[in-house]
Amino acid sequence: CYIQNCPRGGKRSYPDTEVRQCIPCGPGNRGNCFGPNICCGEDLGCYIGTPETLRCVEENYLPSPCEAGGKPCGAGGRCAAPGVCCNDQSCTMDSSCLDEDSERQRVSPDQNMTQMNGSASDLLLRLMHMANRQQQQTKHY
């Protein structure tokens, strides 16, 4: 189970069980499941509701708690990819996940040929923030 959706008693109902890494997913199993429909990896980014996430549903049926990602961020989330914070339900852009001192290793340019220069990365991050704000404004509660 994902730590956020474990059965009654939550992760504390498993006192003798260590929290394990959530199951791998995505191309070449280079990512980890963050929720039943979310697969993220340092060099993959995040897949949400795509075929790459199908395996993540299996985590709901495993009895021991798992936790994916790097350092805590956002509202109950963890850093999932550079600049991305995810919980078991959704992902948001989060600049704290760009921190050079994060618990996750940075991907070297020779491992990731799609890495952008600083200005392109900044522009993409700003566009994602604007899209996220616009999406939040259109939600009705």
Curated annotation (Swiss-Prot):
The keyword tRNA processing does not apply. Vasotocin is an antidiuretic hormone. Belongs to the vasopressin/oxytocin family. The keyword Secreted applies. SUPFAM superfamilies: Neurophysin II (SSF49606). Glycans are attached at N117. GO terms for cellular component: extracellular space; secretory granule. It is found in: Secreted. This is Vasotocin-neurophysin VT. Disulfide bonds join C1-C6, C22-C66, C25-C39, C33-C56, C40-C46, C73-C85, C79-C97, C86-C91. It comes from the Eukaryota. It comes from Pelophylax lessonae.
